[in-house]
Amino acid sequence: MIKVTIIGSGNVGFHLVNLFHNSTKIKLNEWCSRSIDFDERVKVINEIENLSESDIYVISVSDKSITEVSDKIQFKNKLVVHTSGSTPYNSLNNKNRRGVFYPLQTFSKSQELNYYEIPICIEAESDKDLEILKKLSTDVNCKHYEINFEERKTLHPVSYTHLTLPTTRHV
């Protein structure tokens, strides 16, 4: 069973906690959030320096904060991924193994989602870690697609525009 820690409590982090909590094959180890003090589903910590060991750390913060947050993770040689569609994995500190776990979806905390319909774009520095991210996607019943940074950079604005357009037209 893969142990996962989510870092960040914005829209994406909130929904990833739901996704991983609902999986019988993933152990949601903890949720690091500056703004949430308690969640009955998972241990919540407020300081990144207090993280416990997990197999994967998923950084789900603003693009401009990814590097700073990854620098604060005290462990070495762990798989650390971010959820950004427009940031390369090499923005993560290289003391850890690096990758991307990017859900191709616009998120809102007030929106209920069918998580199993959300495609996950994955990328990793090594083939071994890519296999781990494939397993992580499969274990939460999501389809995954191997997409590198250049492809993701092109896909991100197109998908963002498409996914945020109204789905009904008023005549």
Where is each model-derived feature located?
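N-terminal transmembrane hairpin
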Residues: 58, 79-81
